[in-house]
Amino acid sequence: MTPIIKWTLMQRRWSMLWWSIGIISLVVLTLAFYPTIHNQAAQLNKSFGGLSNSTLALFGGTDFFSPVGYLNSQLIYLMLPLLLAILGIGLGSSLIGREESEGTIELLLARPVSRTKLLIAKVLAGGLNILIVTAIGSAVTILMAEAVNIGIPAGNIAAACFACFMLVLTFSSLAFLLAATGRGRSAAIGISVVYALGGYIIGSLASTVHWLKGPSLIFPYHYYRSADILRGTFDWTSIIFFAAFTLGCIVVAWFSFRRRDVE
């Protein structure tokens, strides 16, 4: 099982590198502008004061120009999860799907390893891939936040990035499930993207649109409270939901993959 994990990570080392560079660039550019934004916060608040509650909700529902509001709206609530979700969904759909479509999965199945161990190895490799990129983004965010004196404790930023990682795992595991059941990579990516994007919109607007509160409960974004975490309030309920959703997808993928014929 370990050789499969190492091989999968080696296959994707360049992808991890470029994704890490992209996220580092995003973090540096975003936080480099904070001192300028902070100095003009009063004027900017007047300019943006007319925005509707629904519009504010799409960016985390916080004051854009306070330390927590800026970091949350510009990075933690939307942009970082968005980039990591693109990585995670593409990764989840290809861990099994790419090798199956390329006809190389038979080589893996021919090894003296069960389908269960193969699936576990692929899941662990995918999770490590996302974790490494997230950890790099988290470390750079903490360093940049300290450099621009944003005033948010490093532990709060790390906790928010961890919650972001767990959120992204739900989308990645859904793509993995769909690919493992033989839906194909395109379908796995498409359905997962619609679920993630739809969940973001519905989960964000649920605080201002009453009839969306019920439907929002089935979407991971409803439980993603990054602004509260940055303020120091860490709710384990959200992490439990993310973990249960991810585990459920993996278990269903395991049942499906071990029972079907792989072409």
Show where each model-derived region lies.
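Aromatic- and glycine-rich beta-strand/loop motifs that create alpha-glucan
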Residues: 1-24
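Terminal transmembrane helical anchor/hairpin motif
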Residues: 12-15, 29-68, 191-263
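Hydrophobic/aromatic residues in alpha-helical transmembrane segments
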Residues: 88-92, 140, 173-174, 220, ...
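Long, hydrophobic alpha-helical segments
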Residues: 71-98, 193
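Secretory targeting signals
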Residues: 24, 28-32, 69, 120-182, ...
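Alpha-helical transmembrane segments of multi-pass membrane transport proteins
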Residues: 81-85, 133, 163-167, 245-246
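Transmembrane helix boundary and interhelical loop/hinge segments in multi-pass membrane proteins
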Residues: 89-109, 123
